[in-house]
Structures are given as C-alpha cells and as structure tokens.
C-alpha cells in the first residue's frame, strides 16, 4: 500500500471521551471512530486488523473440521419466547416489529435459531458429530456502553455450534474447541487464562471462559499464589471450614443491644466482642413455585457478599434472586430488614460455610432496634443447612490447599459451553440412534468476541508512543520510510525495490511516499504499531546501508541494504 493513497486518520492528541488505553489508542491510531454511544465505524487500518484476526480464527476452525454458515441478524421472537430468554435477557434485547406486525429480535447470539434450523436438517446419528460456525455482527442494548469496543451495542463474534448423539462425543468436541481456542490466542500473542465459569444466560452443564488480564477488564479471575488453581469470581471457592465450635469455655454471656440512632455499626462497634467479621446478616429471598415455603433465610457474614450464581444451584431458591419486599419482611418477621435474625422463623434457613464456625457472634433479633450479641450454635440457635454461597476474598485459602487466593481484573474474550439438551429439548429436536430409537440432540456452543480481542491485545501491548502489534495481526507488517522520496532518485529506487519485493512475497508493506516531515511519519508509524520499519536515506545508501527498526523490541540498527530482503522474509515466516 502506498501511503499517499491511504486514509490514516491519526490524531495527535488523546480524545477527551476515551475511557481506557485501548479506546484512546484506537481513536488516535485511526482504527475506529465513534458513531453513537456503543457503535463504531471501522476505518481502513481497523478493518485490516479485523480481517487478520478473522483469518486466524477461520484457519483454526477449518483445522478442527468446522464448516462456516451465515444466519440472519433478525430472529423470530417466538423462538426466544420458547426458550424464555426473551425474559432473562430483558431490556438488553433489541426488538423489532415489521410492517405486518411480526416481531423479531436482533440477535445477541444464535442458539435458538441454530437449533430450530438443525431440527429439519439432521435425521441420523451418522451425520454426527457436526460443527457449524459463523462470523457475524451481534447486538445488545447495553445500558451503559464503555471502554471503547470492550462493551458496545454492536460487536463482532465468531459463534460455533456442535451437535452430538451422546455426552462422550460432546466432551471430545468441547476439548477440541478448548485446544483450538488456545492455538488461536497464542497465534495472536495474547496473554490469557482459561478458567472454569458460570454458564449464565446461555445455560448448560459446563463452561470455560478465556480471560485476558487487563486492569481495564470488568471481569475478575481468581488465582492461587502457589498452584494452578484458576476460576472466574462467580464460581471460585476456597477451603470450606464447616467446623462448629461447641467449647463452652469460650462462650460469653448473651446480651441484647439496643439501637438508639440510625448508624447501626457506630452503635455496635462500641459493644464488647463486636466485629463485622463476627456479625451475621440475614437476607430473605423467595423460593420457587413448587416449594411449600414462600421464603428462605440466607445467613452470611456481614463482611462477605452473597454470590447469586452459587445460590442459584440450590434447587429451592428462585433465580434470578427475588428479595423479600419491606412489607413481606414485616409480615413474616415483625420487623425491618436491619433487624432480621434466624430465630423462630417458619421457613428454611441456609448459611454460608463461613458462618457456621463463628462463636459469640452478633445477629438480628427479629425485634426492632434490638440485636443479640454473644450468640452460639446449638446453645442459642439451631444449626442451619450450610453451603458455599459467598464470593471469595483476596487472601482466602486456595481450595486445593496450596497458597492463598488473589484477584486479577480481566477482559472476557471467549466462552465455551456444554449446552447438553437445554435447547434441543425446548424445540423437541430428536435424532435416530444406532438402534433406531430417537434421542434428544446434545449440543455445545463456542463464542469468541472478535472486536473485543483487538481491544484486549492493545491493552496488553502498548507504550508511550502507541500500539505494539503482534506480527500476525498488525495492519502492515513493515513500513518502508524513504527520506526525500520525491527528491532523491537513489532513495526512490531502493524504496520501490524493497516494496516490490514485499508485494511479490505477499508481505503487507506500507510505502510511505507522502511529502511530510520525517519525525511526523515516524511518530505515526509507531502510533499505528507497525512491527518493522526500514528507513532509507541518501546518506546511508551511499555506504550501501539502511536503518532497520523493530517496534516490539525497540531495536534500531544500521544494516546492509541487500541484507534487508532476508530479514523481511524471516520476519514474515514468524
């Protein structure tokens, strides 16, 4: 590409509306421009990067036997009504009504549609396993788009779907896709973790996320300081100490604490033996319709936070969680939420493991303005059912007993799921097995956030001068920078010789034949992040030399002009 024919669109200053490093650099490097909140125009430089990311993904998908298809953006709403995800996604769905009053959804994902499609395409187990994928723009009505292309209303994804006659086949394909994703991200030189994760709105039996460490990330992954333990914060756990302390030697006299002002903890903090970590809060949540009780009381330490995902695994509890209203709390306990306690309740009580090994603890009394202090299990209160229902904290012991847990912010770049029969049951998709009977189809799905990957790579690869692209996805592999291109025949001839060599060998080269100051050109090339540069000047050429630069190593050296071709070829083979 000749620079004088190229739209660079670079900016000298950081735009005031950028809210993270990747966003600022993508704007400054002329990769994107904002259209509206959460939607972006991809400029020539951005599109070159995007196409290279897609090429890597397509090559690896081909290697694992996946076939590419293309599904519509518009999906029939009734399919989403069947799965009930129109409710769980809620206002995040873009819904459209056509002139005949038919309702559609702009797809954030395609599980419903692919299941509906495959129902009429597969008849026998002999056609399985099968992997289909597409690369397509998705839509989500984000309430607050942020961090540039990390959280947007419109984004590009690779979504793949696999189909199986049994779980063994699904497990095999799941592991294949897991390894394929590792290959994809390694080719992009991306630092990442594959972590056990919550299946969330997708549902299913098992899932893993691929997370790119970044301080801009909205996700949190949990790691052990001394082992290979890794998990998303939603599913992370620690060693559970469910030892109940019975030693009466440690018991203090039970007392009531009166609250005479609005600041509960200011009052309690003056009470002997009071600690937030030794105080139990009680929260009422609603149960599912089949339960004989309307509520369940949840007990958790005051300094801990309930993990809704873990609670959702308890069969009786409604999910998403529905908390009791002020009036409902008053009706069943006679007090307000600040004073609820697990005493004389007519419905089940569930406690986190961390609660059960407390002694001389503080709890609500179910009497307004009163708490009980120095309470103990079995002596003053019955022992509840115990579960792991909290978020882990930094410093908690690792569940494998090796080291402590630490937290790392990250960007979710991919997610794979064992869906099982979740969608095929809903749509009654059955297939003939080996003995001629009909079995419900088993499915997996596998997503990669293509546009988000680009932001994650920039977050991990930048310096004060701009982006440092890995070779595999850089918009150009090499920049040929002639000094006085339009004045020196010698410089022009050598520049064009190198440029034509690159074209002949299918190497993405940028010949900067613009009439502008050299320092501006060099700054622009560094900002864009082109990995290699050749600077050609008449002064150096008189000695048969040129200057060679490597962006990622910050290398600058003078080399023989004829040695350039070998270096370029070697770099292109990396």
UniProtKB/Swiss-Prot annotation:
GO terms for cellular component: cytosol. It is an enzyme of class 6 (ligase). It catalyses: tRNA(Pro) + L-proline + ATP = L-prolyl-tRNA(Pro) + AMP + diphosphate. It comes from the Bacteria. CDD domains: ProRS-INS, ProRS_core_prok. Pfam families: HGTP_anticodon, tRNA-synt_2b, tRNA_edit. Transmembrane segments: none annotated. Keywords: Aminoacyl-tRNA synthetase, ATP-binding, Cytoplasm, Ligase, Nucleotide-binding, Protein biosynthesis. Its EC number is 6.1.1.15. GO terms for biological process: prolyl-tRNA aminoacylation. InterPro entries: aa-tRNA-synt_IIb, aa-tRNA-synth_II, aa-tRNA-synth_II/BPL/LPL, Anticodon-bd, Anticodon-bd_dom_sf, Pro-tRNA-ligase_IIa, Pro-tRNA-synth_IIa_bac-type, Pro-tRNA-Synthase_IIa_type1. It is found in: Cytoplasm. Consists of three domains: the N-terminal catalytic domain, the editing domain and the C-terminal anticodon-binding domain. Homodimer. Catalyzes the attachment of proline to tRNA(Pro) in a two-step reaction: proline is first activated by ATP to form Pro-AMP and then transferred to the acceptor end of tRNA(Pro). As ProRS can inadvertently accommodate and process non-cognate amino acids such as alanine and cysteine, to avoid such errors it has two additional distinct editing activities against alanine. One activity is designated as 'pretransfer' editing and involves the tRNA(Pro)-independent hydrolysis of activated Ala-AMP. Belongs to the class-II aminoacyl-tRNA synthetase family. ProS type 1 subfamily. HAMAP family: Pro_tRNA_synth_type1. This is Proline--tRNA ligase.
